[in-house]
């Protein structure tokens, strides 16, 4: 077993620094042709609230430079459609915590796109004694994690769509179906191709590793150290046929020790330290069911600036995202 680094032979490297190399230019040319020929889709994972941003609203409604995260991603999709006359289906995965507000937002904001919504399941939150935490007339719940996409997406029509680019809502620099990525995915006939950036020390991202096959270890579960280790930015392309195959496969559950609000006799309690466990499934645990999957390094400064924290943190906050947008997003989205 070994973590994937910049020196790994099985890492796809279409960039030298921030510029495309010969392989990258080849992939881009292939991808541009395929964007004109194929019906592709994008899934935006939007089940989370902006709790760490001091808001109970869906994270996708948070604004960077006067535009919501949703708006930044919709603009990217519209640019692709305009530039390549691309046929792109748009899907948004919500949760019971975000569904109503997200749908209401898109009803009041016309992006000129046909968007389908589907909702992931919840899981019970349990206390340290293993019993479900009380929540008024029921039990406390939380979204079941991005791994529930394989079950939840069966709610929508995927007919004719060959591949789906799955991204997290919080990365304001996410390149959706960019030609380099699409070209690399089709060139080597992957079931899944994932993007990576070189991981920074103590950065809270999962790490890619090779253990008979490619895997990701979530940041809370890995001990990745060393130079050039590749971090997960939650930007994957899947064959639609693979996603359909995963429908009846149960992914492993991961427990996270969290501060979970609960009630006692109808009175709301907001704990100041972790008091229970949330159960999640992770999308990357599907990797073990692939025939072929791969990872492609991309430049962090152009493709990864997640909004994860409020201003009480010095990283991944509204200011760092604003700076990233000003430097790299406003200039051009598609290259």
Swiss-Prot record:
SUPFAM superfamilies: Nucleotide-diphospho-sugar transferases. Gene3D superfamilies: Spore Coat Polysaccharide Biosynthesis Protein SpsA, Chain A. It catalyses: N-acetyl-alpha-D-glucosamine 1-phosphate + UTP + H(+) = UDP-N-acetyl-alpha-D-glucosamine + diphosphate. Its main location: cytoplasm. Substrate binds at residues 146, 308. It holds the Pfam family UDPGP. The keyword Signal does not apply. Pathway: Nucleotide-sugar biosynthesis; UDP-N-acetyl-alpha-D-glucosamine biosynthesis; UDP-N-acetyl-alpha-D-glucosamine from N-acetyl-alpha-D-glucosamine 1-phosphate: step 1/1. Keywords: Cytoplasm, Nucleotidyltransferase, Transferase. It comes from the Eukaryota. It is an enzyme of class 2 (transferase). A motif (Substrate binding) lies at residues 45-48, 218-219. GO terms for molecular function: UDP-N-acetylglucosamine diphosphorylase activity. Belongs to the UDPGP type 1 family. This is Probable UDP-N-acetylglucosamine pyrophosphorylase. The gene is UAP1.
